[in-house]
């Protein structure tokens, strides 16, 4: 799994949940402030595409890819087409036949941008076989959910569980039959 600070904060819970569901090896790589395709070596930030390139070159390749990026890209790009290009660039690094789950984005301070990004994500993944979108946005947008800390981005303890469940649910749709 490749993600940002949300993923980093949920790493233990995601790993435990996926392990309990039968995966023998779960690797979660989350980093604060990570963006899809923009890194900053001076600050030690590695872009998601760089991590994906490294993972794609490793052997064995992952049975299932999970991407949870976009939070730090929300509000930066001009329109849905720009977000679609960004997402397609990330996907170009991943094997086209590999199962892939992408967890969509929610930021209280960038709701409209998240909606645009998430529509682009849905559109791009609808064209890719063996893909699923985990709907984190919907989880967070429910008024009664109370899953986020006061910053409106990062999950609180209850939100960490909900985020991990969102990941596991998206992966369950894709899990290779031989692993079930």
Per-segment meaning from a language model:
Residues 66-72, 90-119:
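Active-site segments of SGNH/GDSL-like serine hydrolases
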Residues 47, 62-63, 75-76, 94, ...:
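Extracytoplasmic low-complexity repetitive segments enriched in small/polar residues
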Residues 21-25, 60-65, 95-101, 128-132:
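Loop/turn elements at helix/coil->beta-strand transitions in domains of secreted/extracellular proteins
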Residues 8, 12, 16-19, 85-92, ...:
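Solvent-exposed, polar/charged alpha-helical surfaces in well-ordered, non-transmembrane soluble domains
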Residues 77-87, 148-150, 155:
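Active-site cleft segment of glycoside hydrolase catalytic domains centered on the general acid/base Glu
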Residues 108-180:
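Catalytic His-Asp segment of secreted/periplasmic serine-dependent ester chemistry enzymes
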Residues 1-85, 109-115:
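Conserved SGNH/GDSL esterase-like catalytic core that processes O-acyl groups on lipids
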């Amino acid at each position: 799994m490749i993600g940002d600070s949300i993923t980093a904060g949920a790493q233990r819970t995601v790993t435990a949940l996926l392990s309990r569901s039968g995966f023998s090896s779960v690797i979660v790589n989350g980093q604060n402030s990570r963006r899809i395709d923009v890194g900053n070596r001076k600050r030690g930030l590695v872009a998601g595409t760089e991590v994906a390139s490294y993972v794609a070159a490793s052997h064995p390749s992952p049975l299932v890819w999970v991407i949870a990026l976009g939070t730090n890209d929300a509000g930066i790009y001009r329109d849905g087409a720009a977000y679609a290009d960004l997402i397609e660039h990330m996907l170009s690094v991943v094997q086209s036949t590999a199962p892939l789950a992408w967890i969509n984005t929610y930021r209280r301070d960038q709701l409209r941008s998240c909606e645009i990004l998430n529509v682009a994500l849905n559109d791009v993944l609808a064209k890719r076989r063996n893909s699923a979108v985990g709907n984190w946005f919907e989880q967070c947008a429910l008024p009664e959910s109370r899953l986020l800390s006061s910053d409106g981005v990062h999950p609180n303890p209850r939100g960490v569980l909900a985020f991990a469940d969102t990941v596991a649910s998206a992966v369950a749709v894709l899990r290779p039959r031989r692993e079930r």
